[in-house]
Amino acid sequence: MLVLGIESSCDETAAAVVNDRREILGEVVLSQLDEHRPFGGVVPEIAARSHLAHMDKLVAEAMRRAGVGFADLDAVAATGGPGLIGGVIVGVMTGKAIALAAGKPFLAVNHLEGHALTPRLTHDIAFPYLLLLASGGHCQLLAVEGVGRYTRLGTTIDDAAGEAFDKVAKMAGLGYPGGPAVEAAAQGGDPARFTLPRPMKGKPGCDFSFSGLKNAARLLIESLPQPLSAADQADVARAFQDAVADAMADRVRRGVREMKSRWPQTQHLVVAGGVAANTALRQVLVRIGNETGLEFLAPPLKLCTDNAAMIAWAGLERLRLGQSDDLTFAPRPRWPLDPTARKGAKA
């Protein structure tokens, strides 16, 4: 099987061709970082216009690199949500047009499902597994029971981890995007100088919270001489990164206990999403895996951030089950993975 994937839910425009042997035959990702950096975050209107300007040639380049034509495809998959709706519309309409013209099935892929199934693109693992999905817009602990079968064990009750990284980096003058900037600065930081709170640590359940930590970091930054010296930036970054990793570790340990109780056959703890690229977080998760007897797996760094290979793979997984979507599918700004999510829940 051969599937073209299209991703345009935020600030990466991407296209990829993937086969059922877990091979990425052709892949192109165009980042919009330079367009959004002056604003310190993603501007939806700019993102949508950039997707529209570049999508066609990126699809053509991915197909060229794969050495295939549209007639060779078995299906076309595009992110159908959740995400910034302008960009999602661009990707969905492009995917529909190609599918219609080539006479191929169309699959609207949940962006979160793309992340959730990425470990099966990079590793030969069976269901179920415990997934920590941490990105700029999402922070969830999910029991991945199968394609289209997800149980949310925990979620953020306010801000996502990646959003907190971006805001703290901006307040500390570290630049954008915040995740890599904080991690780079933290490498030279003194872990003993500042201590920030560990939100939700020790509390029942598996939910996350980062709003209070973000505010504590703001108060710390404002208490220091302005503008921050390089040493102060490094120490603040280290304190913040350590707090995030420690708080998330507590939630994940609780998630492992619940996972083993409800799905005792679980063998893997996996992480996906842009925050999964953080080395400190990965080190903590490796330790948790060793402590609990679960094998820790993480996709390569390039597949942690938004990409089209994961969308193609999720589409391929659905296609193998005989699934496809009608061309009347409407793009969705919110689209929770688990069907029992409360109304209004963050996707």
From Swiss-Prot:
Protein name according to UniProt: tRNA N6-adenosine threonylcarbamoyltransferase
Cofactor, how bound (note): Binds 1 Fe(2+) ion per subunit.
Residues the entry annotates as binding Fe cation: H111, H115, D306
Catalyzed reaction equations: L-threonylcarbamoyladenylate + adenosine(37) in tRNA = N(6)-L-threonylcarbamoyladenosine(37) in tRNA + AMP + H(+)
One GO BP annotation of this record: tRNA threonylcarbamoyladenosine modification
Disulfides per UniProt: none
Entry-linked NCBIfam families: gcp_kae1, T6A_TsaD_YgjD
Enzyme Commission designation: 2.3.1.234
Ligand binding (substrate): L133, A134, S135, G136, G137, D166, G179, N278
Subcellular location as annotated: Cytoplasm
This protein's UniProt keywords: Acyltransferase, Cytoplasm, Iron, Metal-binding, Transferase, tRNA processing
Keyword set includes Transferase: yes
Enzyme class name: transferase
Function according to Swiss-Prot or TrEMBL: Required for the formation of a threonylcarbamoyl group on adenosine at position 37 (t(6)A37) in tRNAs that read codons beginning with adenine. Is involved in the transfer of the threonylcarbamoyl moiety of threonylcarbamoyl-AMP (TC-AMP) to the N6 group of A37, together with TsaE and TsaB. TsaD likely plays a direct catalytic role in this reaction.
Pfam family, one: TsaD
Family indicated by similarity: Belongs to the KAE1 / TsaD family.
Cellular-component GO terms for this entry: cytoplasm
Obligatory cofactor(s): Fe(2+)
Gene3D superfamilies (alphabetical): 3.30.420.40
HAMAP family on file: TsaD
GO molecular function list: iron ion binding; N(6)-L-threonylcarbamoyladenine synthase activity
